[in-house]
UniProtKB/Swiss-Prot annotation:
Residues 30-47 have a biased composition (Polar residues). The gene is dll4. Its main location: nucleus. This is Homeobox protein DLL-4. It comes from the Eukaryota. The lineage of its organism: Eukaryota, Metazoa, Chordata, Craniata, Vertebrata.
Amino acid sequence: MTGVFDSLAADMHSNHMPSSSYHSLHKSQESPTLPVSTATDSSYYTNQQQQQHCGAVSPYGQLGSYQFHGAAINGISYSTKSYDLSYTGSYSSYGPYGTSPSPPHNDQEKEDCEPEVRMVNGKPKKVRKPRTIYSSFQLAALQRRFQKTQYLALPERAELAASLGVTQTQVKIWFQNRRSKFKKMWKSGEIPSDQLPVGSESSPCSSPSASTATWDFGPHQRLQGATNGSALQSSNSASSPSPFLSNYSWYQTSNSAPHLQSNPLLQQHHLHHHPPAPISAGTIF
């Protein structure tokens, strides 16, 4: 009885061994990408562990080229191909953070741009520029020019500034201050009317247009204009008849005829406003 069981167990064991070898061969053929563990696999895992260890020490260090190890499966060999994974070129251009020095603040230029403003009691206050000190020669030349005219045109101001060796702005400011001072002195009565400069007969600091308006006509032209105005007024008063005589047409024609003949302009004006009355036979006889 035991011999029968032993023979059955031996048969089952012999049948199981080919089937297991068949299954192992079939599985290896189904997945050819999974190579059999060889000595190269052990070296691959060893190199990978060493690279991981180096990467933990220097995360951005130089990485060597990674080479894929091929293996022959069922007599088919795969060519090896290397991949360059070095990141040293891309990270070398970026330096460590915070090492580059920041550009210095140009406080000197800011002080030069705004030298006239400073803080006084917590409030900004402009510092006045130093006053221009003129020499005696410059003051005498400016005063002489001010006696001639109180206002300077742009070419005159440029010429005066060039002759005195000052800027045009300084000449303009000096004339402004001098006009203001002269106006105050004239209002207070410190300056008599005979010492007024030329062009300021009516009031000090008058504009050039107002001062030159009185120079357009000479004294003889003013006198002639006044006599013409008085003659015109007298002629108008003489030519106007009384209300009593205005009813008669013969008085108007006889009285106004000599005057109208002497002045043709007045004759045209008179004929335009007062046409001559028709002469009838009753007035002649």
